[in-house]
């Protein structure tokens, strides 16, 4: 189980009452408990541990499912620290329940690196089983990572959002050899590793049934409805805030003013400041058709917009700056003492940053061994500034581009495609496909704002402060900090129109991304993609022949 199932009691209760009975002892929640409404008994949501025998080699596996010490669950949810869990009588008894265990498997929603919960579990198992292999499957921080806790224990974390399929394998239980791969999740890679000639040969009757069912559900929920044609790519992390290609720039300068401000005609004549937490945005928006499905991918949270009317400008204008100084609010459960706990974004961003800068700095300065850089006034490492300056020069100076062709990219065959580039602490190559790292910019604020238009001419002018409901308590706290003449409470807060963070893009797309001939525009984009070497794949069920025919030059088949 992960932290996202635990913020809301109705979700956790649904897991307990419907999901767990279906999966039985295969659903493991070793340290997560629930007290159902109207009861006083705390019980595990799922099973604490299980034992099973593998089909082919008849190995006996003992498995647990562990969550990090998450403290922001709904009332009635308790998560025990793994360091305390391993001291429990039931856990110690489980380690001694049988003398026949070939390997331990721990499915843990916990970071592989930088979290001592794994070490506590490892030490507890080793106190009873000193050499039995332990396979640990981590998560939560969205990165590709691997760590060997000893010669018989590997921990693997496999990215996020099903972008990565993590493959951990072990041979020879007595003297184990571990290996791992981070496989980009797409049918072509699946076919390659299955030894198939073409991805279409993955098609099976059951798979076609599942696909048809999913297509029917998508149609029933109108997920394929096209709201508009996005004219360009907008990036969540690749471009600095303020750049026209940055998603947060699009949001603050265009979407919030055009969609949110206009959603409440009753206050149309009032000057307003709109504030939103950037963490509500989860992915890039790419050029092309923008569908209802894309809306859920990019902005999945349904936060309403609230407002406090008639706030002095000398108070309102300080809010966004101070919010960014304080950092992102990740959950506002009453009584929370660790507001950032449960948030994976900072570690994931650090992973992207390290991959991007390390890759290019190694190519620019292969003799450089410095791993630390003194900060510059902007707060960015000097190496990052130097890299950005070089990349900019290469883009504008033809002679530099010729001297440093590996920095130019963009032409097929000269540079690997963009993707994850991983450096973990396990031996050997982890990434299954060679990539150029995805560009990354540190300059992303935790909070963004659409300023009043025009800006107030005096500090004593008044504005409506509009904000996503997720940050209501933070806004009220700061209003009370900066306005000594007034005490703000939730009684001063009202709902602003009918816009939600989930509906922002669909509304904006219908205002600005609609074309007279949508079908013609989509057809032209398909033709352009085909011309660039990326034709649409044929349907899976159109391929004939033996799916297990010998594979010759398989990687070439997939290009």
Regions picked out by a protein language model, each given a short descriptive name:
Residues 189-559:
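Non-catalytic terminal accessory segments
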Residues 16-18, 143-153, 180-195, 319-329:
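Short secondary-structure transition/capping segments
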Residues 29, 33-56, 153-243:
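Binuclear metal-dependent phosphoesterase catalytic core
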């Amino acid at each position: 189980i992960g932290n996202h199932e635990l913020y809301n009691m109705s979700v956790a209760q649904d897991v307990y009452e419907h999901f767990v009975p279906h999966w039985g002892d295969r659903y493991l929640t070793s340290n997560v408990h629930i007290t159902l409404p109207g009861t006083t008994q705390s019980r595990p949501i799922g099973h604490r541990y299980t034992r099973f025998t593998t089909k082919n080699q008849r190995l006996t596996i003992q498995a647990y499912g562990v969550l990090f010490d998450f403290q922001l669950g709904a009332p009635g949810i308790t998560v025990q620290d793994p360091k305390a869990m391993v001291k429990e009588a039931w856990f110690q008894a489980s380690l001694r329940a049988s003398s026949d265990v070939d390997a331990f498997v721990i499915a843990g929603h916990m970071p592989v690196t930088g979290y001592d919960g794994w070490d506590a579990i490892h030490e507890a198992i080793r106190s009873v089983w000193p050499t039995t292999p332990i396979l640990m499957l981590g998560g939560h921080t969205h990165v590709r990572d691997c760590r060997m806790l000893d010669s018989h224990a590997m921990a693997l974390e496999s990215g996020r959002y099903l972008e990565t399929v993590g493959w951990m394998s072990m041979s020879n239980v007595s003297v184990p050899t571990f290996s791992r791969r981070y496989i980009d999740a797409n049918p072509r890679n699946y076919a390659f590793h299955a030894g198939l000639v073409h991805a279409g040969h993955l098609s099976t009757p059951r798979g076609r049934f599942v696909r048809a069912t999913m297509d029917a559900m998508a149609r029933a929920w109108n997920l394929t409805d096209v709201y508009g044609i996005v004219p360009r790519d907008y990036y969540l992390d690749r471009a600095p805030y303020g750049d026209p290609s940055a998603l947060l720039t699009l949001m603050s300068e265009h979407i919030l003013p055009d969609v949110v401000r206009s959603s409440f005609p009753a206050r149309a004549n009032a000057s307003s400041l709109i504030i939103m937490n950037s963490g509500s945005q989860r992915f890039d928006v790419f050029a092309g058709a923008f569908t209802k499905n894309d809306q859920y991918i990019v902005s999945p949270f349904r936060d309403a917009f609230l407002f406090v009317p008639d706030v002095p400008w000398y108070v309102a204008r300080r809010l966004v700056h101070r919010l960014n100084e304080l950092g992102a609010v990740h959950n506002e459960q009453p009584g929370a003492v660790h507001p950032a706990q449960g948030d994976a974004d900072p570690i994931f961003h650090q992973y992207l940053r390290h991959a991007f800068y390390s890759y290019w700095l190694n190519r620019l300065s292969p003799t450089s061994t410095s791993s630390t850089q003194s900060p510059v006034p902007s707060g960015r490492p000097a190496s990052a500034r130097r890299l950005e300056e070089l990349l900019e020069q290469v883009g504008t100076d033809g002679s530099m581009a010729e001297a440093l062709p590996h920095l130019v990219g963009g032409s097929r065959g000269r540079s690997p495609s963009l993707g994850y580039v991983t450096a973990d602490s396990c031996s050997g190559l982890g990434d299954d496909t060679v990539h150029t790292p995805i560009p990354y910019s540190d300059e992303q604020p935790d909070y963004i704002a659409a300023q009043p238009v025009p800006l107030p001419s005096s500090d004593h002018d008044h504005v409506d402060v509009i904000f996503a409901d997720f940050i209501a308590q933070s806004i009220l706290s700061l209003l009370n900090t900066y306005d000594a003449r007034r005490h703000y409470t939730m009684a001063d807060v009202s709902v602003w129109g009918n816009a939600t963070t989930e509906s922002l893009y669909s509304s904006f797309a219908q205002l600005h991304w609609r074309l007279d001939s949508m079908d013609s525009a989509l057809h032209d984009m398909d033709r352009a993609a085909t011309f660039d070497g990326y034709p649409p794949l044929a349907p899976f069920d159109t391929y004939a022949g033996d799916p297990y025919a010998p594979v010759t030059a398989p990687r070439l088949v997939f290009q």
